[in-house]
Swiss-Prot record:
Disulfide bonds: none annotated. The gene is Ifi75. Residues 143-154 have a biased composition (Low complexity). It comes from Mus caroli (Ryukyu mouse). This is Interferon-induced protein 75. GO terms for molecular function: DNA binding; DNA-binding transcription factor activity, RNA polymerase II-specific. It holds the Pfam family SAND.
């Protein structure tokens, strides 16, 4: 691959010494690295056996490989690299691929350093004689290769001109004229750039296609009968870069958009004068109605005054009605909230276990359940008929209580009417007595001395 010299061999040896540790860590197993070096007589049989024994004695493999590479450094030969980077080793040790590439790069860099200097310096020493484009530009891409009829055309040796891409050079070439008229953009150090007639015809066709899209205005070209003037104008159109064409197209689009916007604004103003949108409020509606009614009343001043008075009155009424509606809605919402709170509290009171209704109560029986607050018990009608001071109520614990004691147990001792404090089946004893379902004595409890 490379012409081997002493200098190159020395460079490879230095790189080998530099990469010994990397090579040692790239070898992750003993086979076939040790066997390859032994079979090619780079290491002796004794070193081969000692290396295997060291691996069996749990010496790190990378350290053993590094010792072998150090011994190969003493008698370094380029053939060592061929054996080290053989196909078998590269397949068994994938980490060696990157190291192999680094050695190959060393050879490339050495050849580039020792390559004879190019003749480009001699060409640059005499800039007056001119130079070719190929010596300055990098090698062109295949899709940008020049045609055969343009390869022989002379070019000017100008650093600014050569830095441009080949496509821009083709676009900026002027068209030939009967008399070689130099143009301001094409003169470079007293030399002109000729272009073939085919490119001139191609540019003429492209310009003729683009001309109908341009609007008539200040950008229109003034015609002249003289052939020289026509050639100058056509050459100037050819010299227009794509950036200038894009700028002109943007100007045309902006001009057309502004014109359309002006045409659209006029009917919008007319519509606003006749009909007002709902978002403009009551005042704009009043103005629209006033303008209509003034037209209907033949622009009489008296009618206008009457209409304005009526409209003002309507506007006031509308404002007052709106304020009243807002206040009503606010009161409704507050009333709903309060009503909701009341209903919730009423529901809570109805959920008291002493006030629940039970349709299965038989008032003809001598006993029926009663409640007073949180106290529950059983009322005996026969004992109640004897008097309020009699123990006629038996609580849940089985104790006999008088009406007053039962009120104390239910924390209703302060009630003025004990018949309203004691309930049965969700109704007070007063209500049951009025319905004829219960017979009670006088509302005040009798004293013991009576």
């Amino acid at each position: 691959m490379f012409t081997l010299t002493k200098a190159l061999e020395k460079a490879l040896l230095q790189h080998f010494i530099y990469m010994k540790v990397n090579i040692a860590y790239a070898i992750n197993k003993s086979f076939p690295f040790f066997e390859t070096l032994r079979d090619n007589s780079f290491i002796t049989e004794r070193m081969y056996k000692e290396s295997l024994e060291a691996c069996q004695n749990l010496v790190p493999l990378s350290k053993v490989v590094h010792n072998i590479l150090t011994s190969l450094e003493q008698t370094f030969q380029p053939s060592v690299l061929l054996t080290l980077f053989s196909q078998v080793n590269l397949r068994e040790y994938p980490s060696l691929v990157a190291i192999f590439r680094s050695f190959r790069n060393v050879g490339y860099t050495y050849e580039e350093k020792n390559r004879p200097p190019p003749t480009l310096l001699e060409d640059l020493a005499n800039p007056a004689e001119g130079c070719s484009l190929q010596t300055l530009l990098p090698p062109p891409r295949p899709q940008l290769s020049l045609p055969s009829h343009l390869s022989s055309a002379p070019r000017v040796c100008d650093p600014r001109a050569t830095a441009q891409p080949i496509t821009e050079i083709l676009d900026e070439q002027p068209s030939p004229s009967p008399q070689a008229v130099p143009l301001p953009g094409c003169i470079q150090e007293g030399k002109t750039i000729p272009v073939s007639s085919r490119d001139h015809q191609r540019k003429d066709k492209e310009d003729s296609r683009e001309m109908p899209h341009s609007p008539s205005g200040p950008e229109s070209v003034v015609k002249d009968d003289s052939p020289a003037a026509n050639d100058l104008e056509m050459a100037q159109e050819v010299l227009c870069t794509p950036a200038n064409k894009k700028a002109r197209r943007k100007k045309r689009l902006n001009w057309s958009n502004s014109k359309r916007g002006r045409q659209k604004k006029k009917p919008r103003q007319d519509e606003m004068m006749g009909v007002a949108s709902p978002g403009h409020g009551v005042q704009e509606k009043i103005k629209a109605v006033v303008s209509r009614r003034t037209l209907w009343k033949d622009d009489s001043s008296t009618n206008v005054k009457e209409v304005t008075k009526i409209l003002r009155a309507r506007m006031r009424c509308a404002q007052t009605s709106n304020s009243q509606e807002i206040s009503k809605e606010a009161s409704k919402t507050s009333g709903r909230k309060r009503h909701g709170k009341r209903t919730s509290t009423a529901g809570k009171t109805t959920q008291v276990p002493g006030k629940t209704k039970n349709d299965a109560v038989d008032f003809l029986s001598p006993t029926f359940p009663v409640t007073c607050g949180k106290a529950n018990g059983t009322l005996f009608q026969e004992k109640l008929k004897q008097g309020v001071s009699k123990k006629c109520i038996q609580n849940e614990a089985g104790d006999w209580l008088t009406v007053k004691e039962f009120l104390n147990e239910g924390r209703r001792a302060t009630s003025k009417d004990w018949k309203k404090a004691i309930r049965c089946n969700g109704e007070t004893l007063r209500q049951l007595e009025q319905k004829g379902l219960l017979f009670c004595t006088k509302s005040k409890p009798q004293k013991k001395g009576a």
